[in-house]
């Protein structure tokens, strides 16, 4: 899959964005600053990478945890999670089912629109994601706007996508860092 759009950091920093993803968990995120594309994070199947802005270099992240493209609630039991419906709650003006997934001490709360079951909000210990502007892409409904909020506000961003290409084949070197 190839996601294209822009990311807004803080109040006024805005950068063109491309996110390359390939199963099972390969990923590369690129932002364009000026006219130069910069890889800011990625995973090559063995190592995670992230930009170290102090030395302006992409570096291996020893504590990187590869994530599946499928969210935890898809086939949650086989992934070791338990689920509990906590009732209904509003997200904006939409009524949502509030569902908590738990694995060990990790909890994530999901809010699904009661009308269409779209995931509108995901709350983890250190980040809240808000999904909106849903559009159909090759028969799949996907959010074209994702807002991330953190408790300390230092990692907040808004991602606005203008194009999503599914089933995209990438050159072999796409995920080599």
Name each region found by the language model.
Residues 6-7, 86-89, 134:
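Short, solvent-exposed loop/turn elements at beta->coil junctions and helix N-caps
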Residues 10-13, 33-36, 81-82, 92-94, ...:
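Short solvent-exposed loop/turn micro-motifs enriched in small/polar/acidic residues
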Residues 1-54:
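N-terminal mature ectodomain segment of secretory-pathway/periplasmic proteins
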